[in-house]
Amino acid sequence: MRLKFVFSRCENVQISRDDNVSAIKNSHVVILGVDPSQVEATLSDIAIVEALRGKLLISIVAGWTRGAIERLIDAEWEVWEGIRDQDTRGAWVLRTLPNVAALVSQSLTAIEDHPSPTFPPQFKDIATAIFTQIGKPMSIPPALMPATTAVSGSTPAFWAIIVDSLIDAAVAVGLPRKVAQEQIYQSMRGSAEMLQSGIQPGELRDMGTSPEGCTIAGVMVLEEGGVRGVLGKALRESVTVARAMGKVGGKVGEKGGEEVHVNDTRKI
């Protein structure tokens, strides 16, 4: 109902509920945006499979590889391996991954490079145009998608925890919470823009530190507390779980699964 309200004034937008087959039949491009646990049930509907035939299916579902989705769409996936033409395949599946910053049109959206030489190039252009509307799209090789799932998809939550801890500390030393929030948010935004301008992280750190100063004192506490190791391990753990999620469509190393990595935090 919320989407219906948002788009109620858009003449060229139609809201369809409880009739996915009809919506797919009347569309050229379909975005698969269900919960990961609902992918199999959604794509097990033969009517949906038939409606998808020959169309571009853009997946934004974390953990589901392109191969796993394609096998769900049609049990004859192994036959399609050598055919790859739009008339005989179930759908052209393009794996993507936006993040929560799409809410403010600042998403970093990973668009997986499709391995098929016959993948219609206009489909990649369509996906890029779509995700440009909500932030910055980036082409990513298939082997890097598990890492990107965490680096792009998980880090907003990490930033939120870091920012929340800094705000609480600012309140503890006397700042009103709203003032602390405004200062920390702007500091984070300014730092991000400086880094995006080409300034290196170490360079930015050195800009704010002076001998016996307050900033270097705080930096030393972070270093002594092992902040680099903790953040690094948190990110590697997220990537490890992302690889495990990729096993949905097959065992590790098989089509649809994700390759293990030497720096994974554990074996799953």
Predicted regions: what they are:
Residues M1-E11:
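NAD(P)-binding Rossmann-fold cofactor-contacting core
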Residues A68-W92, L108-A147, F158-S197, V241:
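Internal alpha-helical scaffold of NAD(P)-dependent oxidoreductase catalytic cores
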Residues D18-I111:
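Rossmann-like NAD(P)(H) cofactor-binding subdomain of soluble oxidoreductases
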Residues L94, M145-A150, P201-D206:
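Short pre-catalytic strand/loop immediately N-terminal to key active-site residues, enriched for Gly-Thr
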Residues A62-W64, P98-A102, S152, S187-R189, ...:
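Glycine-rich beta-alpha junction loops
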Residues N12-S22, M138-I140:
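Short acidic-hydrophobic, aromatic-tinged amphipathic segments that line or gate anion-handling sites
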Residues E182-I268:
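NAD(P)-dependent Rossmann-like dehydrogenase/reductase catalytic/cofactor-binding core
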